[in-house]
């Protein structure tokens, strides 16, 4: 009996060993995969990004996270990444040409990833960029038919269920591209998360064409717009008509006749009683260059201008306008070095961190300051309760530097610009003043025969990096939350006389100055007999 029991035990142990070995082989077979490929997350890329801790104080733009710049400023090519992790807006000249020619494919893409909930980036960015950029190229169809297994016209297609070798190879290539892109995003880490752009290629293309609306914005920006419309902090009461039917020539003539640059001249209360007539510059801003300037540049502070190599072109203009605390030192290759006019908001004058009193940024240039005022442009009310008290530092600066041209924009000029934007937009826009960028553009149009504006409407380098000189990311910097930026850009796009190539590659629009605009004389009023 014992020999039989011993033999039975040996067989049982052998069976267990064989079963365990078989299980191990099956387990290894099914779990063998690329170790570099991450496990899919139940959250989308954008939703994961939202879970990151928000650092710093809330900025003027709703929901923005601010990271202070490192000491000594930023190096444009070391401190800041070149493009967002998916590489969706970084393209060489060849890719750009392909992109421009594949325009038909854009119009049916989704606009913002947050619009449709938990979908991966692949729902909005093509898996295979080469395939995407090649679409619409001459000979593309014949090439694709040969390499991707598509039948030529008149040839029968593959049978259902058949998988040609070329099609299998294409799938393998796409899989490899997908793995490489995912590993690249992981390697970018937090910087990549922050640089993820909520603007899809489709939206950017439609912005270039002037065919976008607020309904295409992500939910956060839509909510911000609704909140500002409800709050109506400045008491806006628009009584005009909202339409967008004017031609470019009609719109230019409207701007020329109504958007007349106006600054405080000290003749109105309460400034007249405070002696401002002697304080403000004797020569008005509009008369500093009575003969006009031939060609001018307006340089936005957008992060998209990094790696543009536009500095030499910008400095070639007769005059250059810059904004707020945007520096040139260390960024000359991209933004140039020349500064003629600097637009500054009231925060620059009141916040000690901007060093308005002693910084070289604000010396040897024409300064133009502004502060949000009530829509009624009640100067007494504004003087008593400005958004930021720019009046005291203005007085001090004028007393110390009486020879430097320094102006404060009149609220009526700013709100006149807002009225024009609203009149030429069918949607209700935010009841807040236009951005410094739009104000600066209109000022230079009044002083120059031709105005070249850089990165106001973004180029293919578009990024959520708000300013090229500080680490601060938010889509609102491009599309607007407080300011009606989206509608400003649509209006400027309608005025653009430059080429689509310059708009795509350089983010440059070319606008005629008011001196170069020829408008019909108003019809004389015939008295009734």
Curated annotation (Swiss-Prot):
One of its GO terms (biological process) is protein glycosylation. It is an enzyme of class 2 (transferase). Residues 142-186 are annotated as: Disordered. The chain crosses the membrane at residues 12-32. It is found in: Golgi apparatus, Golgi stack membrane. It comes from the Eukaryota. Belongs to the glycosyltransferase 29 family. This is Beta-galactoside alpha-2,6-sialyltransferase 2.
